[in-house]
């Protein structure tokens, strides 16, 4: 038996609407990236790689961007 969020939270509850919106966004993500054609294990591999790459990019930006911004400010003599 499949239980939808409307059965648990009611069709008009804010949690049910939020769940429906997140489900819709995930569905759009699957359609835009064409992941709906992949098998579940392939989708998991793709999503894992995507999360890893985005995580590394965010971490690198967090670590190195302040140094680069400070170097630019020193170069243009905005900060002494």
Curated annotation (Swiss-Prot):
Segments on the Lumenal side according to the record's topology features: 39-43
Chain positions of site Within the serine palmitoyltransferase (SPT) complex, defines the length of the acyl chain-binding pocket, determining the acyl-CoA substrate preference: 37
InterPro entries: Ser_palmitoyltrfase_ssu-like, SPT_small_subunit
Any one GO CC term of the record: serine palmitoyltransferase complex
Protein origin, superkingdom: Eukaryota
Membrane-traversing stretches: 22-38, 44-66
Keyword presence, Translocase: no
Keywords attached to this entry: Endoplasmic reticulum, Lipid metabolism, Membrane, Sphingolipid metabolism, Transmembrane, Transmembrane helix
A single GO BP: ceramide biosynthetic process
Keyword rRNA-binding on entry: no
Pfam family, one: SPT_ssu-like
GO MF entries: serine C-palmitoyltransferase activity
Bilayer disposition of the protein: Multi-pass membrane protein
Pathway named in the protein's UniProt entry: Lipid metabolism; sphingolipid metabolism
Cytoplasmic compartment segments: 1-21, 67-80
Subcellular location field: Endoplasmic reticulum membrane
Complexes and interactors: Component of the serine palmitoyltransferase (SPT) complex, which is composed of SPTLC1, SPTLC2 or SPTLC3 and SPTSSA or SPTSSB. The heterodimer consisting of SPTLC1 and SPTLC2/SPTLC3 forms the catalytic core of the enzyme, while SPTSSA or SPTSSB subunits determine substrate specificity. SPT also interacts with ORMDL proteins, especially ORMDL3, which negatively regulate SPT activity in the presence of ceramides.
Family to which the UniProt record says this protein belongs: Belongs to the SPTSS family. SPTSSA subfamily.
Protein role: Component of the serine palmitoyltransferase multisubunit enzyme (SPT) that catalyzes the initial and rate-limiting step in sphingolipid biosynthesis by condensing L-serine and activated acyl-CoA (most commonly palmitoyl-CoA) to form long-chain bases. The SPT complex is composed of SPTLC1, SPTLC2 or SPTLC3 and SPTSSA or SPTSSB. Within this complex, the heterodimer consisting of SPTLC1 and SPTLC2/SPTLC3 forms the catalytic core. Within the SPT complex, SPTSSA stimulates the catalytic activity and plays a role in substrate specificity, which depends upon the overall complex composition.
Name of this protein: Serine palmitoyltransferase small subunit A-B
Source organism: Xenopus laevis
Gene coding for it: sptssa-b
């Amino acid at each position: 038996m499949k239980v939808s969020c409307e059965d648990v939270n009611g069709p008009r509850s804010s949690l049910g609407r939020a769940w429906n919106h997140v489900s819709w966004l995930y569905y759009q993500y699957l359609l835009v990236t064409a992941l709906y054609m992949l098998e579940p294990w392939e989708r998991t591999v793709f999503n894992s790689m995507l999360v890893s790459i985005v995580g590394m990019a965010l971490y690198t930006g967090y670590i190195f961007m302040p140094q680069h911004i400070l170097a630019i400010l020193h170069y243009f003599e905005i900060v002494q």
